[in-house]
Amino acid sequence: MSPPWKLFADHLRLTVRLTPNGGRDAFDGIETGSEGETYLKARVTAIPEKGKANKALIALVSKSLGVAKSSITLVSGETARKKILRIEGDPEDLAKKLETLSG
């Protein structure tokens, strides 16, 4: 199973499946979708209204990886459960942190 992130020269792209209004802000491991794609499962307490859940996801990723919120950009999936995040920084270091988070 390939990880739900891809390394680039100066950033990492992370695929996430977000559950808004999920009772707590946390990651729930890596899952493989029906089409074989992998994603990091995340849940946030925020509701999916006016970008609140997306902001909560960025805050969760920022805190968990120890990076600034401003270094995380939502590339796609603004109104979908499946999202792609661009995270600026050392991609190797970010990948190691994600491996630890995803169990």
Swiss-Prot record:
It comes from the Bacteria. Gene3D superfamilies: YggU-like (3.30.1200.10). SUPFAM superfamilies: YggU-like. InterPro entries: DUF167 (IPR003746), YggU-like_sf (IPR036591). Belongs to the UPF0235 family. This is UPF0235 protein RHECIAT_CH0004196. It comes from Rhizobium etli (strain CIAT 652).
